[in-house]
Design a protein with these regions (language model features):
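Flexible, acidic/Gly-rich N-terminal and inter-domain linker regions that tether
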Residues: 1-114
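Conserved Radical SAM active-site core
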Residues: 84, 96-123, 133-199
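Short pre-active-site segment immediately N-terminal to redox-active cysteine/selenocysteine motifs
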Residues: 127-131
Length: 199
């Protein structure tokens, strides 16, 4: 039986190992092991074992600062539910599709997706700072789509050739995880395309 009173979280254990206020360091220090997450939140080892089993296809990734906002000992904490791998993720579900928003058919290669006239989605990266369990792109084939800085020139070229594209949406993963200089270069190149009005 679970106790309604849990011991407090050890806040020092949640701090990045290198005391720098740099997002890249915070991401490097993020928790990737379900057992560590459960230990930090005073959750039962049974929960950790179940989370480990569900962790294989879409691994846990959660920054320590995010964990510090979770209620210790509370399996129903909404922030915990967002990141904790659960065995239900492994269940076969009738009518489940791995591409719920239909992006596969709209792929234009070189990291571009175009589902609607006048706009396209440019996949800048496959990574995020947090792996949310509800992510609709968790099974997206990023390697096949060309979502990487090396493919940006081809993507920008394709946008430049299609005068119907007025809006380019940077997506991924989280485009803000890309190095600032690379992102700046991409934005500057898109800004040179006369028909692109919105980014």
């Amino acid at each position: 039986m679970e106790s309604s009173i849990a011991p407090p979280i050890d806040k020092k254990a949640l701090q990045p190992q290198v005391a720098r206020e740099v997002w890249k360091q915070e991401l490097a220090d993020a928790v990737r092991d379900p057992s560590e997450l459960c230990d930090l939140l005073n959750l039962d080892s049974v929960v950790a074992e179940k989370a480990k089993k569900a962790n294989r296809d879409f691994p846990l990734l959660v920054p320590r600062g995010f964990i510090s906002r979770m209620r210790p000992g509370d399996l129903n904490d909404p922030l915990l539910l967002q990141v904790l791998p659960r065995l239900e993720e492994l269940d076969d579900v009738p009518n489940f599709v791995s591409d719920p928003v239909g992006e596969q058919a709209a792929r234009q290669g070189t990291g571009l997706i175009q589902k609607y006239h006048g706009r396209c989605l440019l996949l800048v990266t496959s990574g995020c700072a947090v792996n949310c369990r509800y992510c609709f792109r968790r099974e997206f084939p990023y390697a096949e789509s060309g979502a990487s800085p090396s493919s940006f020139a081809a993507a920008v070229g394709k946008v430049a050739l299609d005068s119907s594209i007025q809006e380019v949406i940077l997506s991924g993963g989280d485009p803000l995880l890309v190095d600032d200089a690379i992102l700046k270069d991409l934005i500057e190149k898109l800004a040179l395309i006369p028909h692109v009005q919105r980014l």
